[in-house]
């Protein structure tokens, strides 16, 4: 019983949620016991209650965190491993696999995970950042592959520094990592080499018979009879840079024997002149097994097994030059039995006998054995070890770029945010899509036409079609019964416009109706600019000559001399032929370059797409290569070796090795980038294969959206400036300690603090739904500070979703800005009254369809569409206000029920008839038919109770007389230890 009680208590302790996550179709939670529960659309089926995720035995340890992407769960366990759980895999069992393992990364354990739309970030104990999943927006590896199924380390090879002083644009220069410090590689350690061999029937040594006389030379010495056997060895050698190997070898000998037949022995004797060794041809009449190990040792528990000899094992030290062969000596056990030796004078032979097996050893042709003095024999064994190793070749020093010391990771949608210990924010991914929409939110053309204008219109009454005509009969054949179509004569109208506030010489202007209607027609024909985050103008303006008008105060540069246009077809032709097919075109600053999928059109001149077009200006100056991406469609890519602002783009540098790409299509894949690099330079691009974006040939992609034509201008206020790039991280400096970062849909909400200063909130990015809390729908490209007086006290946490941002203050109040269904609709932070401060919200999971809240005490709340059962409320009805998700509360109630059963008397426990598996959807607000409380079966309001105004009913006692006929209606009470009525 005590074990059951302890198990029930442990269940109650382990059922507290500690982490939540959600995507568009499901919700998952991790409890303090490491269990993972999920609800929603799982495996193509709707589950409207939480179910425990059955993973597999490969997940060792306890799961401590979970993050969801659009179709997967990523699990972090306390061993530092990260697993991917593909719960929608098209098979009977979901696929669980490891995407990050400390064993493969030098024991560096994962300690934190954050997830975006389809990617995940992993932070380790050593401060390294890894990523897995989608890389479509280069949110993991600049210019890398489209997707990474296993984690890849995120390396910073280059940066683009954001300059917040340019209010209308991103501008930047290459920062600290432009000239990386490459450390020298000092190789003091040895390489490790392995030697291993398994040999059979090899010569291993000799049995030495001493005090034996041989004629000639009629000297007394030692006769050595060769011994053969089976041996295997393995060892590890340390090889230095000079090719010298030292180490140890472990050997195992299973068989020793003397062969039958001809043998090559030796005779050794000493005299005054020294030691002499003479080889002898010997013959053996029979094979003698000296030692035989048990090849298949029996189990220790097998009492009937025959005992066998253990192999001869040992370890010996060896050393030598790589490529040579060294000798390893074998240590013979002290009590090792050896054959006995006798001498037959009649036959001049010696007899070796072991275990009733004899062999006669005779010297052939080379001499005769003539005398023997009995003496102990010895056994000497050794074997040859070829040193199959090589002297290490000089290795080039591994290129290591200095990496920041990472302090925090954040992710959302297609953006990855890394924060270092200097509070610099590195942003990867789709933030390059944002641009200022300030001009798009201005008044329309019609408002500009009638701005400050007093208009009066005069017209004759007969021009109004106000007559009450009878219904027209279309079937009437008589033309007289048909009404004539009414036509208004505009020449009879008069329109008078006055400008009383105008500073013009003419305070009043008269405009004819035709002029007014023509202007009105122009407004109607103009492209509509509704409040949107997309630019209305299809032109891409490039300032190519004169003063570029850079808002950052950079010096003006010399005019542009020429611009070269590439596209995919011309690049493929260039790469295949190793020579460009160039077509030169004279242009000026009013030239418009248009293109489609078939051809260029430059000032009404058609040029084939496989041509490399060189636009020649009249003035000399820095050369700029412009590449137009036709298939995406649209893009401008160029290199620059001039000074700042020679072209109206904001990423700038002063070295000719930088290649700038301006693209207003989708992101180029690695193959396209490689071809582009080859087209721009036929040099070697990669000094080290570890880095995809080498620092000697940097290609910076600047992505914007636009139309299908480019216009070159001297100066134009509509110049599109954009410097956030997907190919390298953009670095933001706020000079404040970064506390928290909310990553929304192409926007950032950063919570910063400092010594003796209250926390502040800075925002940047897309704001089409007011999610930045600035009171407008203006998308901003420079940091703006929120008014902290809006909040009741300082903000401690921020959470961003698509089109909405939540703020949690120190008083546990929850504020929100943006738009989320009918729950939130405000461009400034407003307190959410339906979220009680007593809940002390500590975490939030925000999706388009639902919001999940986690309280500090482990309570979970949710709201949303719930059409797939994502909230786990046992139904699929819409939930419009934050509602407690009582699954884990009911799970604890079930554990309490088991706890009570464990303490109850066995007879009472057996008679409850409620030992059914836990099913949360059977329970009501008070627990169900088997739960305690006033609404339970034995409570006053339960089905067996008397009710609020009644006495005890006939069914109050749950145990019937038919079960206990001797006691009638009285319940069995052993020793009166069970109180039947008020048990609960």
UniProtKB/Swiss-Prot annotation:
Q: Where in the cell is it found?
A: Virion
Q: What is any one of the record's Gene Ontology cellular component terms? A: virion component
The family database entries (InterPro entries) matched by this protein are listed as: Ran_GTPase-activating, RCC1/BLIP-II
The residue ranges crossing the membrane are none
Provide this UniProt record's keywords sorted from A to Z.
Virion
Q: Does the keyword field hold Phosphoprotein?
A: no
KW Protein biosynthesis (keyword) present:
no
| PANTHER family per UniProt | REGULATOR OF CHROMOSOME CONDENSATION
Name of protein: Uncharacterized protein R345
